[in-house]
Amino acid sequence: MRTNPTTSSPVVSTLEEKNLGRIAQIIGPVLDVVFPPGKMPNIYNALVVKSRDTVGQQINVTCEVQQLLGNNRVRAVAMSATDGLMRGMEVIDTGAPLSVPVGGATLGRIFNVLGEPVDNLGPVDTRTTSPIHRSAPAFIQLDTKLSIFETGIKVVDLLAPYRRGGKIGLFGGAGVGKTVLIMELINNIAKAHGGVSVFGGVGERTREGNDLYMEMKESGVINEKNIAESKVALVYGQMNEPPGARMRVGLTALTMAEYFRDVNEQDVLLFIDNIFRFVQAGSEVSALLGRMPSAVGYQPTLSTEMGSLQERITSTKEGSITSIQAVYVPADDLTDPAPATTFAHLDATTVLSRVLAAKGIYPAVDPLDSTSTMLQPRIVGEEHYETAQRVKQTSQRYKELQDIIAILGLDELSEEDRLTVARARKMERFLSQPFFVAEVFTGSPGKYVGLAETIRGFQLILSGELDGLPEQAFYLVGNIDEATAKAMNLEVESKLKK
């Protein structure tokens, strides 16, 4: 932790003795810089280019040292566009890694990768900054308490419950609902959550970032009248940013979250959308730095880069960071190196299925692919565990019977199997749920369902008490009482039509 009340910029530390170099080569977002003998900067040091281009426009580009090439030359990756830079321009070595503002002054504001506010609300009033590169907490500092984090989403709470202070991954291909699910989790958890939240937008759509900001202002998570009372800090490095910014914006968000955990001793929520873009940016940078690509063209340092980010997201005896990360799955292939490397670090995985999304079942969470280390009788209790296992067994049996149904039809199944299929189809629909953040699209009001209500609903379906109700009564409802009420309404409507 460093306090530098003298600097206006959060990036550059005090530069009494300037260590100056000159640009020798520019290849897109990568710069080669020559320094005087014996004055070489360290790896991860921030370099700043302050100059004017040919038409007199001010240039202010920050880079990060990635390689020491020899012959007094270093290779650095730019955190913003390199337009207007020329060979021979002066480069200042700041003598320290990128540092960003941390603490209460960051709440309610939007930052870029350098920790500069980008919301047009004036400068951030903070004197406390922290470097984005830090080591993970020591093993002895870690907290090992196990407790459930209730989300109000039926399929998550029942089949793959989240751990308080754990790491959670939302896996899915393009357009199956990762961002909507992460928005709903922000809505359900961040609003009811007493602590603070940090949202890292890594390489995703600018429009979604803007929507989230507006949504948070409307809901009061960001307090416009008194910004200091806000509960969230936003850090964006969107799709249009250079790979250097997308590669480091996750670390900027994490650094802000770590301060709340370690210094303020708070419980923090860290949302990252999307962790795949962090890997993708690392892959782009790796190729630009001339490293030999590894499997499927990814960087050879994939596991190391992922580990250095994920190991810092943890709970210590001071406070906790509960992290929810969206993970894009290229071509719906979960064995792709990027999602496969992420799996190893997570306590719970929520896998979104294109098949369910095509059926119109939202959230399209696959009940069989989603997993959680918390689903154990000693943690969640016997009743919850037994119900979850029976739901999974029924879903698995239905999946096995689908080929037979497709070829021979339902009538060729045994009585027992027909009953299993009917209950599985009801459960599949009951796992859907109207979301608060999707109200404007669906026209249905959002529903928050407590864990006890969720367990009761599935027990009633499994016991056979609701076998007489139609399937559509279970679609997009909250608790089981709404399903029975919907069934009665459907019955009345059908009688009126006759």
Swiss-Prot record:
Binding site for ATP: 172-179
InterPro entries: AAA+_ATPase (IPR003593), ATP-synt_VA_C (IPR055190), ATP_synth_F1_bsu (IPR005722), ATPase_a/bsu_AS (IPR020003), ATPase_alpha/beta_chains (IPR050053), ATPase_F1/V1/A1_a/bsu_N (IPR004100), ATPase_F1/V1/A1_a/bsu_N_sf (IPR036121), ATPase_F1/V1/A1_a/bsu_nucl-bd (IPR000194)
EC number: 7.1.2.2
GO molecular function annotation: ATP binding; ATP hydrolysis activity; proton-transporting ATP synthase activity, rotational mechanism
A Pfam short name: ATP-synt_ab_N
Gene Ontology BP annotations: proton motive force-driven mitochondrial ATP synthesis
Keywords: ATP synthesis, ATP-binding, CF(1), Chloroplast, Hydrogen ion transport, Ion transport, Membrane, Nucleotide-binding, Plastid, Thylakoid, Translocase, Transport
Membrane topology: Peripheral membrane protein
Catalytic activity: ATP + H2O + 4 H(+)(in) = ADP + phosphate + 5 H(+)(out)
Cysteines engaged in disulfide bonds, as pairs: none
Key word Thylakoid present: yes
Subcellular location: Plastid, Chloroplast thylakoid membrane
SMART domains in the cross-refs: AAA (SM00382)
Role, per record: Produces ATP from ADP in the presence of a proton gradient across the membrane. The catalytic sites are hosted primarily by the beta subunits.
Subunit relationships: F-type ATPases have 2 components, CF(1) - the catalytic core - and CF(0) - the membrane proton channel. CF(1) has five subunits: alpha(3), beta(3), gamma(1), delta(1), epsilon(1). CF(0) has four main subunits: a(1), b(1), b'(1) and c(9-12).
Family: Belongs to the ATPase alpha/beta chains family.
Protein name: ATP synthase subunit beta, chloroplastic
Taxonomic placement: Eukaryota, Viridiplantae, Streptophyta, Embryophyta, Tracheophyta
Gene designation per UniProt: atpB
